């Protein structure tokens, strides 16, 4: 009889950051707001209880609209106080559904892996039903499962770095593959291994993708390989060992003979909401230390040449690349995609500025120093690393001027740099020719500097 949805007034790109939960009768009528989240949280995927008396939803600090993660809350259907039923779990809920047996079924990102769990909304008792490497959806975002009426059988999209996406069905965690539409796709990259390390009291995880076409049983123990660090976007996101999408140039580097380290520093999903919030007002500091200590761990575990290290990433990963080259000379080459150079100028340029107050604690006009302290441009004179800068000319999330500013600053101080701006591209490129060009340019830049 009624729908539950998230909505906000206006049509701006960032209105979802201030969205509320509304109900509306199926027959039409006025929408009724039943929940307004605090300013430091976002909400997503509301679902009715079987008896129609409550609405469940996911709430947490989320940096990107489609990338959902947080705890599970329940609010009365008529409005009122919301209750967190998963406080303190060391995982991030990514989607949910509320079947007729009364227990909430949800996806969980945990420690670099993907899974399905259920929680009793009354007692909070949790049960993990399935968990493993890869992802239970296609390219990371959206509900990953279609549940049958019995509440036990489901269809799901499964994928990993070893297997492309296919549909599986059956009892949860006893799924059988029912499609083979991508059977012709074979990985051209090496094996991915999960690695763990500790820093500042956090237990951290990342994926180390090995170079392709190396017989490790016969490999010369003295031979070492270059490594590129690829930092994920977000920062509220998580690096899975998932089949690559069109923007995953790390696999191309593995195919070309590189180790590729893909860390999940603080601020990522997968370790609980407190971990995701651990980079609030701390961009570039704790998260950067997590990445650098992760590199140390990778060097201990694999034959990596510490003198041939590179760093790259897109969006938050592009920011972290810009930040890294102003903080250390450890990297011999860098590629910054759609990065953020100057948070003070960025505040007035981007179309999604509502994400910034939850992460920085105030607007740039109220506390400019908190933005300056975390801006790569503030420390630009330290940058010595040759850096390729890539961006789309219509990017509203990480606007083109940010890349211009960083490139111009590097040129001014005499650091080797190149800038490539792609026509008619936003934050995520859609033209296959441009996607291919990015992969080829990234590989060529690192081949020139690290091989």
Pin down the residues of each PLM region.
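Blade-terminus and WD-like Trp-Asp/Gly-His loop motifs, strongest in beta-propeller folds
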Residues: 1-3, 46-54, 96-103, 145-153
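A flexible loop/linker signature enriched in serine peptidases of the S9 family
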Residues: 6-22, 33-47, 56-73, 84-94, ...
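Residues that line or immediately flank small-molecule/substrate-binding pockets and catalytic motifs
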Residues: 7, 38, 50, 59, ...
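Conserved hydrophobic/aromatic positions in well-ordered beta-strands
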Residues: 22-24, 73-75, 117-119, 168-170, ...
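Short loop/turn segments that connect beta-strands within beta-propeller blades
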Residues: 25-29, 76-80, 120-124, 171-173
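Beta-propeller fold detector
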Residues: 32-36, 82-87, 126-131, 175-181
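Disulfide-stabilized cysteine-rich extracellular repeat microdomains
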Residues: 39, 51, 87-90, 101, ...
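Serine-hydrolase catalytic core recognition
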Residues: 142-451
């Amino acid at each position: 009889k009624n729908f539950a949805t998230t909505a906000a007034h206006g049509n701006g790109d960032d209105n979802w950051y201030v969205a509320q939960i509304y109900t509306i009768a199926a027959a039409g009528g006025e929408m009724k707001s039943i929940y307004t989240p605090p300013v430091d949280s976002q909400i997503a995927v509301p679902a009715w209880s079987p008896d129609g008396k409550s609405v469940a939803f996911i709430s947490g600090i989320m940096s990107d609209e489609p990338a959902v993660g947080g705890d599970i809350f329940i609010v009365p259907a008529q409005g009122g106080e919301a209750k967190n039923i998963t406080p303190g779990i060391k995982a991030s809920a990514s989607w949910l559904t509320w079947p007729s047996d009364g227990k909430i079924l949800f996806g969980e990102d945990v420690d670099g892996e993907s899974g399905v769990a259920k929680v009793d909304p009354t007692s909070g008792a949790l049960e993990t039903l399935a968990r493993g490497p890869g992802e239970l959806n296609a390219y990371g975002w959206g509900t990953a499962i279609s549940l049958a009426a019995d509440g036990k059988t489901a269809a799901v999209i499964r994928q990993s770095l070893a297997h492309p996406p296919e549909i599986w069905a059956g009892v949860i965690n006893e799924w059988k593959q029912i499609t083979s539409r991508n059977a012709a796709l074979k990985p051209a990259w090496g094996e991915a291994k999960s690695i763990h390390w500790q820093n500042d009291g956090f237990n951290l995880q990342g994926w180390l993708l090995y170079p392709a076409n190396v017989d490790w049983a016969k490999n010369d123990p003295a031979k070492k390989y270059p490594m590129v660090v690829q930092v994920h976007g977000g920062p509220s996101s998580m690096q899975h060992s998932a089949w690559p999408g069109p923007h995953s140039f790390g696999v191309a580097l593995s195919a070309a003979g590189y180790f590729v380290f893909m860390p999940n520093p603080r601020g990522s999903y997968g370790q609980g909401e407190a971990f995701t919030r651990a980079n609030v007002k701390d961009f570039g500091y704790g998260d950067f230390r997590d990445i650098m200590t992760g590199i140390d761990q990778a060097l201990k575990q694999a034959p990596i040449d510490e003198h041939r290290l590179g760093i790259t990433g897109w969006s938050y990963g592009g920011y972290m690349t810009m930040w890294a080259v102003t903080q250390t000379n450890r990297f011999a080459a860098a590629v910054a995609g759609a990065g953020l150079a100057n948070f003070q100028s960025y505040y007035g340029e981007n179309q999604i500025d509502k994400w910034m107050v939850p992460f920085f604690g105030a607007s740039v006009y109220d506390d400019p120093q908190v933005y300056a302290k975390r801006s790569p441009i503030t420390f630009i004179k330290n940058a010595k690393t040759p850096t390729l800068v890539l961006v789309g000319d219509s990017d509203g999330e990480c606007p083109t001027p940010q890349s211009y500013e960083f490139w111009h600053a590097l040129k001014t101080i005499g650091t080797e740099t190149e800038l490539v701006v792609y026509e008619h591209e936003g934050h995520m490129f859609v033209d296959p020719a441009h996607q291919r060009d990015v992969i080829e340019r990234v590989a060529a830049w690192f081949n020139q500097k690290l091989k």
